[in-house]
Amino acid sequence: ALDPAADCPASRVAEIIVAPYNDVDALRQLAERCDVLTYEFENVDADGLDAVIKDGQLPQGTDLLRISQNRIFEKDFLSNKAQVTVAPYKVANSSQDLAEIDLSKNYVLKTATGGYDGHGQKVIRSEADLEEAYTLADSADCVLEEFVNFDLEISVIVSGNGKDVTVFPCLLYTSDAADDLLCV
């Protein structure tokens, strides 16, 4: 396993290479030690993986990884290719793209790449939030999403091999405190 933290959960069951997920030398070491590689989230360097894997060593490939690493690509893929309903959104390449938003609605502005768990995001509820939103939109390509009211948040892992598809049990996210997120 590759992880920046020596005491990561996988360390209890696997030999660990301690390095950032974008360390190509560490990815190479991992590829040399393993017959098959997988990844569980989008914080892995797709170019680095492509540079070090052997044919067939990464069954899921990097196409979906690249899509999931860019919110613009992800929204386009989900809404146009997968026909999934997503929150109303628009691409914002600069603060000018935010000039005429309807402030009777709430939004979240998210950087297209690099942001996660609230990083690279700005909630827009009123005109008072626009200055920070303009700064963010001028610093990177972004996606402006309308807020969607929801009752719960789940994660679903789906795995396929081109013939068979497996849907794993859903994970329900609950929050007992402002910063504590639990999966049950």
Feature locations, PLM:
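Short glycine-enriched loop/turn motifs at secondary-structure junctions
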Residues: S11, P59, Q83-T85, T113-G118
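ATP-grasp fold ATP-binding core
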Residues: L78, Y89, L103-I124, S139-I154, ...
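ATP-binding N-terminal substructure of ATP-dependent carboxylate-amine bond-forming enzymes
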Residues: A1-Q69, F73-D76, Q96
